[in-house]
Amino acid sequence: MIEITPIAQAHFKKLLEPQKEGTHIRVFVINPGTAKAECGVSYCPPEAVESSDTRLTFDGFDALIDEVSVPFLEDAFVDLVEEDAGTQLTLKAPNAKMRKVKDDAPLLERVEYVIQVQINPQLASHGGFIKLIEITEDNVAIIEFGGGCNGCSQVDLTLKQGVEKELIDEFSGELNAVRDITEHESGDHSFYK
C-alpha cells in the first residue's frame, strides 16, 4: 500500500524518539478524490488512533491511515531526499486526486484515470490540463485543452507527441486516436504565444 524507504523510516524513527510513548505517524489525504487533494504526514498519539484505522508496521513505528484515505494512498511512496538546501521528506501519492481504477473497468474510466494521474500533472507545469469529453464508438478519445494549453502555439506538438502517444501506448489495441475539440484562443493565459 504505502512504501516508505529505509532512509525515510530511519527519519521517522528518530523524530518519534522524543515523543510520548505509543506515538506513531498518520498518513492522510485532505479532500481525497478531488483536484484539491493534499497528502500529509503527522504525529499520531495513542489517543488519536481510531478503531477503523489501517495500521502498517515498520521498523520502530507504525503508520496509521484513516479509512477514507486508504484507497487514495494506494501505491504511495515516502522518501527522504537530499537537496542542496538540506533534506526534504517527499510523499508521492498518484491516486490522491482520483481513486485507482480496476484493470477491467470501462475504457472511459481507465483513460480518465491516466489523464488525471499521468498526463495532467505534466501539463500543470505550464498551467494547463486536458479534459476527457467522450470516447466515440470507433474508440477515439475526444479531449479539450484548458488553462495554459488553450491557444498555446505548441498545442499540436503536445497533442500528437505527448497526449496521443501516451494514451495510444497505454491503451494499445483499445484506443485508435485522440482528437482535440478545443476552440483555441491565444491570450495572456497561453503558455507559448
UniProtKB/Swiss-Prot annotation:
Molecular function, one GO term: 4 iron, 4 sulfur cluster binding
Keywords: 4Fe-4S, Iron, Iron-sulfur, Metal-binding
SUPFAM superfamilies in the record: Fe-S cluster assembly (FSCA) domain-like, HesB-like domain
GO biological processes: iron-sulfur cluster assembly; protein maturation
Xref: InterPro entries: Fe/S_biogenesis_protein_NfuA, FeS_biogenesis, FSCA_dom_sf, HesB-like_dom_sf, NIF_FeS_clus_asmbl_NifU_C
Record: residues binding [4Fe-4S] cluster: C149, C152
Cofactor(s) needed: [4Fe-4S] cluster
Cofactor stoichiometry and binding remark: Binds 1 [4Fe-4S] cluster per subunit. The cluster is presumably bound at the interface of two monomers.
Family of the protein in this entry: Belongs to the NfuA family.
Stated role: Involved in iron-sulfur cluster biogenesis. Binds a 4Fe-4S cluster, can transfer this cluster to apoproteins, and thereby intervenes in the maturation of Fe/S proteins. Could also act as a scaffold/chaperone for damaged Fe/S proteins.
Subunit structure and binding partners: Homodimer.
Name of the featured protein: Fe/S biogenesis protein NfuA
Taxon lineage: Bacteria, Pseudomonadati, Pseudomonadota, Gammaproteobacteria, Alteromonadales
